Amino acid sequence: MLSTVSVFFMSIFVLLCFLGILANGFIVLMLSREWLWRGRLLPSDMILLSLGTSRFCQQCVGLVNSFYYSLHLVEYSRSLARQLISLHMDFLNSATFWFGTWLSVLFCIKIANFSHPAFLWLKWRFPALVPWLLLGSILVSFIVTLMFFWGNHTVYQAFLRRKFSGNTTFKEWNRRLEIDYFMPLKLVTTSIPCSLFLVSILLLINSLRRHSQRMQHNAHSLQDPNTQAHSRALKSLISFLVLYALSYVSMVIDATVVISSDNVWYWPWQIILYLCMSVHPFILITNNLKFRGTFRQLLLLARGFWVT
């Protein structure tokens, strides 16, 4: 029997996931419709479509995984369904991190203003590289998934054998594998996109600082369109940075700390794990004129439906 606190946080988790699924689904539908109509997408829309799709699938699979683990704790450890779910989750986690990184790089390249030849070359070439970067991210995620699958399959086979050297129990052996294999693998495979993400934001902050210094003697600097564009993008990226960092840290902690479903902190921890992919889509929608207009119309229609 779940406690009142657990039921409360479980309800928040379900609501958060459904809102994220709706927001990511909205982005995917909008961009898919545009792709069908025009036959092509802008580089930024390609990244947003990829990011929205991976997050949509990640939340659906994560929702199933959280409840399956909570309701069938004993069966979860020895079920083949765990390997299947982990296979999808590992791929989607890696792909989502990479797609989010390319989004931050695109922000930096489009808005930042540097005269370095390497940056100018990247600004010129990046739009054409986006499809290949997305395909490369999928390939890297597939390779990472295979490495995680090997570890998960080893755990499953060990659980069936129950034979270990010395007096080691399965729980102790599994714990050692988590620390010696899964955690280093997660750190290595996520540190590269996370580093690129941080570099992009730092470059954008530096560009904004330099632009502000050049415009500080201009009485209309606050109304300057470029300054306003920098400020809006910076606020969006800072919020993305906080959510991205929270997602990264929580994922690393999740690899080392196992919280059982009967623990009172299980559902609050699930909320933290899925917070970024649920909140950030709404930030993207509110900062995108095309998304914002359609989303506002849908909200008005929904409001009118419930009022009547």
UniProtKB/Swiss-Prot annotation:
Membrane-topology annotation of the record: Multi-pass membrane protein
GO CC annotations on file: membrane
Classification via InterPro entries: TAS2R
Organism domain of life: Eukaryota
Entry GO MF terms: G protein-coupled receptor activity; taste receptor activity
Extracellular side: 1-6, 82-90, 150-184, 261-264
Membrane-spanning segments: 7-27, 61-81, 91-111, 129-149, 185-205, 240-260, 265-285
Positions bearing carbohydrate: 152, 167
Matches recorded under PANTHER family: TASTE RECEPTOR TYPE 2, TASTE RECEPTOR TYPE 2 MEMBER 41
Protein name: Taste receptor type 2 member 41
Organism taxonomic ancestry: Eukaryota, Metazoa, Chordata, Craniata, Vertebrata
